């Protein structure tokens, strides 16, 4: 497991403990002796939101009790995406947890008043398990790299089944995830989001490459556009696994939409190839993990939707990732990808 804190912002955890203790006391009227312990940032994961783990202790009805918790704070200066979907993230997690169709942590409290911690935040239950971290890459070192082929196979299948389960969630009642009037849902919504993203980073020298990428994709518009919920950052690294390599929880719902079923599958297979596929660019090849074709076949079997035209959605995934990389370049001051490499990635020169 990585020892590196990758949070976009950090704060004094003793001060946070004091503020949250008082805040929780007002929300737990039956509790006394409220105390927070073991506050810490996740290691090797959690780059988009400031996320802090802690254990909540209290006394209620004469009994000592405790609950593992996570506080997730809305991004401030370090904003990776142009759309503020923090409220939608919380509401979707609440809906998914209530339905039980996808393994999502329970949101216990949601605070919209920024005066408490400087920005809105929510507190959810802390699940116990292990995360395939990005830093260092899970395929190179750590528990996934050290697992047996059979264990990795179990992990891969469990992950794909949860990915597919998202596409069995009815969209009724999720209208709060809709986009603007001209692109309320479906591919139009997800497309509109990234057209606006490219415009958001228009002053970057990579912007002409991104625009060319959009033009290429538009000229090849896919026929297959199955409806479905978009998780967003759909990858093994945003799932937690237990000692049996089964999925405990699906995490990081920060960019949801009603944009269609194939975006998450495309993102998942693209990241899988990058992290642990035969041509892994960031991680290393891991035997035991299912191939792209096996992933697509299992996903179709579980969710019952067609993955036709997936190649287009994979190319769109590369455009999305390039947008994110350009924004991170602006935030960090270091070019995430050479421009020539971006042109090759987006197939525009």
Regions found by a protein language model. Give the residues of each.
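Active-site activation/catalytic loop segments of kinase-like enzymes and analogous catalytic loops
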Residues: 263-304, 317-334
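Catalytic-loop of the protein kinase fold
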Residues: 229-231, 236
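Protein kinase-like catalytic core scaffold
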Residues: 69, 103, 122, 228, ...
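ATP-binding pocket architecture of kinase catalytic cores
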Residues: 40-210, 221-224
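Activation of the activation-loop gatekeeper triad in protein kinase-fold domains
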Residues: 251-256
